[in-house]
């Protein structure tokens, strides 16, 4: 054959040799079809986008990630690829917390059929800090409803524009029969919910117990 292990795609000649006619009555000639008897077809090369992550910041994601290649032959590498790498998928322009596809495209190679596989962009929720609001109650009464101040909003957002719903909870060190004094309580996320924020950091507030009247 005129092809070798490193020959590129195409059709190659295959010659049959070594045959003889014991009687000497025949002469062997190469068939015309032998000229294209061997076809080298493209190898399959998979190009996979790596995963990426960011924390919600109100800005749209653009661009891509690292690439992983699977299927190169003959010690070849990414430097044989041509074209302009681009990234598509619903990750492009993604803003809100969630998972999105990062899909590579735009590359080619003479001896390969390229298959593009997506990676995942994860936009994580931004963390909010809940600081317990100070409150008071009379001796023997129940604690008032807990409330908290939220900090950590990004991109100029606030409680309303960030779409926060619900209210804070709390765990108090003061019991119903605790004497007059000041006690710490730790706010909790309660029923708070928001698409792009997580309620994960907490600063204690104070409950002041005053004498009963």
Residue ranges of model-derived segments:
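Solvent-exposed beta-strand/loop surfaces, strongest in extracytoplasmic domains of secreted
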Residues: 1-213
